[in-house]
Amino acid sequence: MFFKSLLRYKWYALSSLLMTSLMIASSLLLPWFLKHILDALQEQNSQTIYSMGGWLIGIGFVGLAAGGINVTLAAYIAQAVSSDLREETFRKIQTFSYANIEEFNAGNLVVRMTNDINQIQNVTMMLFQILLRLPILFIGSVILAIVTMPSLWWIIFLLIVLIAGLTAVMMGMMGPRFKKFQTLLDKINAIAKENLRGVRVVKSFVREEDQFHKFSQVSDELLSENLYIGYAFSIIEPMMMLVGYSSVYLAIWTLSGMIQAEPGLVSSIASFIGYLSQIIFTIIMVGFLGNGVTRGIISIRRIKEVLATEPAMAFPDSPDEELEGSLSFEHVTFSYPNDDEPMLKDISFEVEPGQMIGVVGATGAGKSTLAQLIPRLFDPQEGSVKIGGRDLRELSQGTLRKNVSIVLQRAILFSGTIADNLRQGKLNASLPEMERAARIAQASEFISRMEESFDSAVEERGSNFSGGQKQRMSIARGVVNNPNILILDDSTSALDAKSEKLVQEALNKELQGTTTIIIAQKISSVVHADKILVLDQGRLIGQGTHAELVATNDVYREIYETQKGKED
């Protein structure tokens, strides 16, 4: 996944590798030229001093220029790769079913698309700017240091063993900690998101302190975990520096006796110290970058987990079809993910094209669940749902969206314009089509009063509209494509009785050939339906006209009489 994204920018990556090679060559050659300059100083060979000095300065400038170019290349690659991964992750999430979303939860997915992608961007920047350079520079410096002073090989070996041990301990300690840190980050993001969405409820019941306490608990856990990681790295980095500088002291202590015995070794010793300094530099950088690299690796795994997830529902790749509006449930049993108890149990019924069907029942009876099976937001565990005699699992996603439209109880609007929101129902909806949909939904009145009409702005979550206005726009979005089956999931609950009646009259007049499924809390909303389905604890316990059910169905009659009594 990560390397596949890198391949799209292979020429930038290869250019970065070339610059890295020049930087490494510059770093490895500088101590070698320094050795020869010192030898020339001892021999008082001015010609060699000038020529080698010129090479030294030239190579230094090449390394500096290569470093500057490489920073630009690394920044471009990191931003491009992270942008591609963010888009790929978002595109993948768009294919997820409700079950997939519930598996991760929305807050978790938001963190993965933001924080985790940022971590990947950082580690990509590190990779091309520093990480690719470190191992080659380390190996090259080790080899040249040993070649320069073979008798001091044991100092290099001891240094490598100690650093390898420290790195192994660090990775073993930090891996689980970073994973827990990301989990807590997901959790605190979910709490914040939930609180902001439900801010009216929080303030209505004066629960600010409770919400703060809940947030504070997770925040304290997150702080504790972050502090542990910080403390660990604050110990590991100085330890690596201590090991590195101890090796320099050990080398100087050993070399001091050698210089007294053989003064001509000064140039070799200076070169050796130069290479040893580069070895220590790579060690310190490993300690310094370990935090970011470990986080980046975990973030790559988390993004890979999303991209590797197969959608819970697959749609056949077939041409879009026009279907008649008949609907049938055949022995349908359904339970939500992670729920043991079925929400719907052995449901069977048939609907003829153009009929109006009401669905009633107590809260939790399964009305909305039944509605969500019709546009195939979920698949039943048993039985089948058919439209036009065709099993939903045989239909392409385009066919379903073309023929079936659902208007949910909770009116969800997207930031943009009114036209943008209506075109969620039909991508290329014309102005006359939107005006017709608005008339049906009784939204024309307030839209026409707005200065920019259908081009008027919709703020985030439709916060600049009332509940009734949002619900009417949601209904308009549902009818704009003139569907063969329209599902209204208690979608007139925010409307007054007059507006609700006008919407129903407009639906009957304008969508005469459309099969309409109305999920209702109030029986008055479906009293004129061709057929009413009565649900109770997930079972279909009755179906018929209003008059038939009042006469024969105890549950329906009880609901009707209770509501009638309240109205009286």
Where are the model-predicted features located?
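Hydrophobic alpha-helical transmembrane segments of ABC transporter permease domains
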Residues: 7, 18, 26, 30, ...
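An intracellular "coupling" helix at the cytosolic face of ABC transporter transmembrane type-1 domains
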Residues: 8-10, 95-99, 115-124, 128, ...
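Transmembrane helix-loop-helix hairpins at lipid-water interfaces of multipass membrane proteins
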Residues: 7, 13-69, 73, 146-151, ...
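Juxtamembrane helix-loop junctions of ABC transporter transmembrane domains
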Residues: 18-19, 26-39, 59-106, 110, ...
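Helix-loop-helix
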Residues: 44-48, 58, 144-158, 228-302, ...
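ABC-type nucleotide-binding domain
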Residues: 323-568
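A short amphipathic helical element positioned immediately N-terminal to and/or at the very start
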Residues: 1-8, 109
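Short intracellular "coupling" helices and adjacent cytoplasmic loop segments at the cytosolic face
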Residues: 43, 79, 87-111, 115-117, ...
